[in-house]
Amino acid sequence: MALIENFEKMLASGKDSALLRFSLGNEYAKAGDAARAVEHLQAAVRLDPGYSAAWKLLGKALAGLSRDEEARQAYTQGIAAAEGHGDKQAAKEMAVFLKRLNRP
């Protein structure tokens, strides 16, 4: 929780950035707070729509909250972002997660 507190203080001091929001989202996800993770990860991708790692984690957090349609959208946008940066591994991982979500 110390990392979360430090990151929240940075955010409160006006140091908002995609990396800070991704870091907060990641820490909240690790702490089991998917709802707070989603909040920060959505901010991360708003600040940097090409941030494929944030899209991937956002998709996972949304899926964890059973918000499957939103997770599909996050993975789809994340795949496009990853492919735009030539990040084939991230695109491949998100394609696998998307395929799992689409299973009946």
Where are these regions (language model features)?
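Structural marker of alpha-solenoid helical repeat scaffolds
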Residues: 13, 47, 64, 81-85
